[in-house]
């Protein structure tokens, strides 16, 4: 991955976010779908992102599934890609998903994912493919009481078949039992919740009733992915809650190579 060295000098009242491009962003129209992780940056390609910000609140978490704070979202959505993106005008554009739609009035939504998207570490080293299983793992995390502690649960609880039942089920377990749950085939999540992964690059969400606007919600953090392989590498859910820019995995256009609370993000 092409990297450029970025530096940020924090001023007394102004901070800035400089994120190093990792070349793994969404493919534009006409591209093959490859992330181009080994290719040189094209002429004119943005490799550094600079966002001036007043020094207010800092990041509380690097787990995009856990937070609904604007400060966290502004940073983390540049590091992690979800299914879809929205323009300032509200138009939906492909993210990890390159095709999506419903054939039954919005009761069931299917998203076809782009192949070749990689999870990478802070140095741009490839760790794993980003697949539909990661989006299922993300939803399991959201609906697991002990993993998520009620953050970002309202939309899936109200919309997805079996979501509320699974959330209540996890509350009946011990913390140790609940933290050990995954979204793997044959798991309680896969049996109870309306999230199906028929292959590595297809994920289907089944709603309680017809939701013709469900795709507009696919930009929200509650539908973001998490790699179970990363969870395992870090040592489990507790370690994910405590992860930082140095040990998290990225699948978006930028990595955060340096983070100093209240001072610097590079």
Predicted regions and their residues:
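Solvent-exposed coil/turn segments that connect beta secondary-structure elements
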Residues: 56-59, 88-89, 105-106, 114-116, ...
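Short, well-ordered beta-strand elements
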Residues: 46-57, 108-112, 135-138, 203-205, ...
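Gly/Pro-rich hinge or "lid" segments in bacterial periplasmic/extracellular proteins
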Residues: 176-182, 189-193, 200, 206-266
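Extracytoplasmic/secreted proteins, especially bacterial periplasmic and envelope-associated proteins
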Residues: 74-78, 82, 91, 95, ...
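Short, solvent-exposed loop/turn elements at domain surfaces
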Residues: 45, 58-67, 91-93, 119-121, ...
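Aromatic- and charge-enriched surface segment that lines or borders ligand/interaction sites
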Residues: 98-162, 204
């Amino acid at each position: 991955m092409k990297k450029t060295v970025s530096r940020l000098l924090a001023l007394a009242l102004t901070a800035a976010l400089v994120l190093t491009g990792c070349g793994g962003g969404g493919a534009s129209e006409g591209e093959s779908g490859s992330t181009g992780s080994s290719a040189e940056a094209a002429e004119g390609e943005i490799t550094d992102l600079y966002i001036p910000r007043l020094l207010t609140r800092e990041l509380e978490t690097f787990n995009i599934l856990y937070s609904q704070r604007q400060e966290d979202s502004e940073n983390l959505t540049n590091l992690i890609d979800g299914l879809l993106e929205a323009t300032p005008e509200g138009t939906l554009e492909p993210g990890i998903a390159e095709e999506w739609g419903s054939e039954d009035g919005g009761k069931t939504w299917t998203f076809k994912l782009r192949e070749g998207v990689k999870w990478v570490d802070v140095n741009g080293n490839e760790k794993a493919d980003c697949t539909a299983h990661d989006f299922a793992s993300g939803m399991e995390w959201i609906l697991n009481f002990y993993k998520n502690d009620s953050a970002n649960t309202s939309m899936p609880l109200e919309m997805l078949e079996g979501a509320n039942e699974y959330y209540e089920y996890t509350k009946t377990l011990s913390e140790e039992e609940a933290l050990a749950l995954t979204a793997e085939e044959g798991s309680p999540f896969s049996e109870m919740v309306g999230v199906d992964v028929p292959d590595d690059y297809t994920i289907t969400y089944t709603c309680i009733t017809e939701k013709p606007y469900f795709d507009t919600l696919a930009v929200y953090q509650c539908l973001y992915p998490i790699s179970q392989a990363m969870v395992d590498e870090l040592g489990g859910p507790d370690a994910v809650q405590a992860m930082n820019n140095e040990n998290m995995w990225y699948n978006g256009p930028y990595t955060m190579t340096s983070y100093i609370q209240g001072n610097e993000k590079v």
